[in-house]
Amino acid sequence: MTTATHPYDALMDITARPKAVFVRGAGSYLWDDSRKRYLDFVQGWAVNCLGHSPSAIADALAAQAKRLLTPSPAFYNEPSLKLAQALVANSAFDQVFFANSGAEANEGAIKLARKYGSLHKGGAFEIISFEGGFHGRTLATMSASGKKAFEPLFEPKVAGFKKAKLNDIASVEKLINDNTVAVMLEPIQGESGVWPATDQFLQELRALTKAHGLLLILDEIQTGMGRTGKLFHYEHTGIAPDIMTLGKGIGGGVPLAALLATERAACFEHGDQGGTFNGNPIMCAAGLAVLDEVGKPDFLKSVTETGLLLESELQKVSARHGLGGVRGRGLLLALDLKLPIAPGIVAQAFEAGVLLNAPQVDTLRFMPALNVTRAEIAEMIDCLDAILTKAGAARRVA
């Protein structure tokens, strides 16, 4: 299959894609090869936290590319040392391992927990994760995930994962046994439809894991780097995990992820973990640029304010069209449509030049750039409102 200028069939057909081919991006907008402009409220699934091709990242990449691409992970390099120090200084953790993707960071978290169990808990290896959770597409992270669609795939799965119910502390407690080493979850389950763990539940979970000597692992791949109005979501809750993973926004569009751990949990020994591009100077230069921007005065305050504005506007849409309300935090929000019409709305919005996401058939997810403007929010809301009005009229006629 081809467009006028681009063949498709050399790429593995792993997902349904619209036929547009994007060639340029700036801020909250993308342009395809026919010069059509799109307002992007997906941003690579919360990857482009500063929008498309921001000068801060582009300049950092260009400067680093002229200095050093990679010396091998067998040697230290300046950007990785600086980024690790900055992450430690701005978090509850003591050490960092850099990875190429969120799935790789989560795989590392699973390995680290098992290593901890081997050293300190008599070989305990089981990890309690959650129904509806999503931790990646490696075999182990798919096994840790609670995504129904994964269940029949690539059997046999990796053993050692038990699933509890989100926001149900009793369901966690009853799964704990002598083989349990950790509890792993996303503070907000993105792929299942933006379902937040309550602050109270996370506090109860922290108390429970401490009481049983278990590690608490937070997957902040989608919620981290300012997405919810704090640098890391756990800061909203008054607790701190033992292990945290980052991805998506930490690279601002460049493949970068991180595994962070407290001194107590950071028990890897030489040879336990590694990778050819881990801590690559180019990737870490992008991470430093992102952290510098997100750390500027009032940046996170602006994310909170903009998130409240987007939530308010979506609530108005929900009320006007008799929908199921809004959930989420900051600039990671979902609109409950109450009907399985989300894919159709996404398709119509695409034709109208607005990119939206449907993690479930009855849910729209919103993940704009953290510096999205009020005017851009208004533009998206106008488009969504028009589509829902048309859909409502069609249902009434039917």
From Swiss-Prot:
Pyridoxal 5'-phosphate binds at G102, A103, F134, D219, E220, I221, Q222, T276. The keyword Magnesium does not apply. Its EC number is 2.6.1.11. CDD domains: OAT_like. N(2)-acetyl-L-ornithine binds at R137. Gene3D superfamilies: Aspartate Aminotransferase, domain 1 (3.90.1150.10), Type I PLP-dependent aspartate aminotransferase-like (Major domain) (3.40.640.10). Its cofactor is pyridoxal 5'-phosphate. SUPFAM superfamilies: PLP-dependent transferases. The modification N6-(pyridoxal phosphate)lysine is found at K248. One of its GO terms (cellular component) is cytoplasm. Pathway: Amino-acid biosynthesis; L-arginine biosynthesis; N(2)-acetyl-L-ornithine from L-glutamate: step 4/4. Pfam families: Aminotran_3. GO terms for biological process: L-arginine biosynthetic process. Binds 1 pyridoxal phosphate per subunit. May also have succinyldiaminopimelate aminotransferase activity, thus carrying out the corresponding step in lysine biosynthesis. This is Acetylornithine aminotransferase 2. It comes from Bradyrhizobium diazoefficiens (strain JCM 10833 / BCRC 13528 / IAM 13628 / NBRC 14792 / USDA 110). The gene is argD2.
